[in-house]
């Protein structure tokens, strides 16, 4: 197993309502504790405003620049995840940062630009906190996703929302470029990554192998067969 700094790309061919509702469903499950949950959303410029509006309409809170700075200094301290935010509600995390949000806020979203580790929002956060990036085009989106995976998610999970029929070439390139053992398409990444309900292609498990990319001997979801000596 390993860290899962999961990026989710929303292509301009995506069903925006499906994408946003899936990400919220995933990120609020167990308050973002599942390591396959989305840590960053990368949205193509053409649909960025529509995606932002959909997140806001569904109870997510977009931090202004001042609030973003307060939250970034709360989620990561001295280069490490602040244990006080792990699995907490969005409103609780906001309060820790001195930011006031509606009590029912589902996710805190920081609109950021850098994918470097110097950007706190680019880290794995294990809480209902998301980074949101604007991508100029699909190549820019792929590049950002690759960088975020390199920041701390090699071998784990990556996700994309698009029309898989019309944009098969994009999907094939995404699958080929992302160094993750789970490639999820139009699927909530928490539930899709752990298998079963949303993804019958994966063995149900909360222990997710990251393969040689993540320094693991197993690349699939770990089950009882991996505990048997043969």
Where are the model-predicted features located?
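ALDH superfamily catalytic-core signature
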Residues: 1-116
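Conserved C-terminal structural/oligomerization subdomain of aldehyde/semialdehyde dehydrogenase
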Residues: 99-230
């Amino acid at each position: 197993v390993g860290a899962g700094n999961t990026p989710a790309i929303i292509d301009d061919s995506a069903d925006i309502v499906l994408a946003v509702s899936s990400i919220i469903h995933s990120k609020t499950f167990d308050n973002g504790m599942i390591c396959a949950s989305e840590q960053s959303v990368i949205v193509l410029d053409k649909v960025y405003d529509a995606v932002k509006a959909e997140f806001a309409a569904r109870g997510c809170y977009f931090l202004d620049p001042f609030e973003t700075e307060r939250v970034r200094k709360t989620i990561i301290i001295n280069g490490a995840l602040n244990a006080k935010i792990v699995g907490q509600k969005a409103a609780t995390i906001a309060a820790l940062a001195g930011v006031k949000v509606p009590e029912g806020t589902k996710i805190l979203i920081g609109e950021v630009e850098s994918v470097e580790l110097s950007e706190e929002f680019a880290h794995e956060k294990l809480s209902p906190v998301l980074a949101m990036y604007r991508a100029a085009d699909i190549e820019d989106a792929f590049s950002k996703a690759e960088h975020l995976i390199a920041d701390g998610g090699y071998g784990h999970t990556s996700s994309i929302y698009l029309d898989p029929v019309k944009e098969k070439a994009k999907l094939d390139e995404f699958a080929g470029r992302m160094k993750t053992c789970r490639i999820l398409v139009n699927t909530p990444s928490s539930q899709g990554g752990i298998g079963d309900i949303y993804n019958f292609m994966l063995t149900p498990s909360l222990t997710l192998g990251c393969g040689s990319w993540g320094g693991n001997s197993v690349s699939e979801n770990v089950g009882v067969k991996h505990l048997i000596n043969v």
